[in-house]
Amino acid sequence: MRIALGISYSGSAYEGWQSQLSGNTVQDKLESALARFAAQPVRTLCAGRTDAGVHGLMQVVHFDTVLHRDMGSWVRGTNAFLPSDIAVQWAREVPDTFHCRGSAIARRYAYVVLESPVRPSVEAGRVGWVYRPLDGAAMRQAITHLVGEHDFSSFRAAQCQAKSPVKTINRIEISERAGTGSKYWHFEFEANAFLHHMIRNIMGCLVAIGQGSHEPGWLLDVMAARSRDAAAPTFSPNGLYFLGPVYEDHYGLPNRTAAYDWLP
């Protein structure tokens, strides 16, 4: 049988999602916990690999097993062996044709950025940080150039293994919430797929525009160049959240977890 799990995690202490020799990745911790609960090795595939420091609100994985246990047992049993900053949120039996990555029709990410003259402390690692004010109108104008199908080579990491740089961004939304002498900015992205570091590189450009270093139309020049050298520096992974994949309704998989309501 094939089982899908929804996983949430804080990425601050880990070297990203994908398994490494060090064993200090989210995938390594999850597979170790699953193996202890199932008393046999378990290999997982994920909907989207995240970098070191990036958090996941609803990563989705799947694996095949001959064990027949109720779905609640997979949640409680696996969580019993996971560190406190990783948790299985739900488990569902899915058809053998389901693939957590291949069946996804879209992926969603969010950036939470603190605008403040003082760096974050309690929120360290959970928010990005800028100390110069951001111009929301300029950034909102800039994102209109990104929505749709484009060649995103200028936002692609050198080590990206994607076959094509052409992706379709369905939507980008920017909102803000005033704090005491500060602001929390919330950027949400949805696309059919993302290139390696694509969101972090886009964020670097949006921050540069928001701080007045470039005009919104500069993004058109960046995209036309199809060169990473044309774009702004990569933004910090702090404050970046993988909100999860989007699947067709007939799979019956949840699309939110409680952590969504926690985001600033």
Swiss-Prot record:
Its EC number is 5.4.99.12. The active site is at 51 (nucleophile). The keyword tRNA processing applies. InterPro entries: PsdUridine_synth_cat_dom_sf (IPR020103), PsdUridine_synth_TruA (IPR001406), PsdUridine_synth_TruA_a/b_dom (IPR020097), PsdUridine_synth_TruA_C (IPR020095), TruA/RsuA/RluB/E/F_N (IPR020094). One of its GO terms (molecular function) is RNA binding. Substrate binds at residue 109. It holds the Pfam family PseudoU_synth_1. It is an enzyme of class 5 (isomerase). GO terms for biological process: tRNA pseudouridine synthesis. Keywords: Isomerase, tRNA processing. It catalyses: uridine(38/39/40) in tRNA = pseudouridine(38/39/40) in tRNA. The keyword Calcium does not apply. Homodimer. Formation of pseudouridine at positions 38, 39 and 40 in the anticodon stem and loop of transfer RNAs. Belongs to the tRNA pseudouridine synthase TruA family. This is tRNA pseudouridine synthase A. The lineage of its organism: Bacteria, Pseudomonadati, Pseudomonadota, Betaproteobacteria, Burkholderiales.
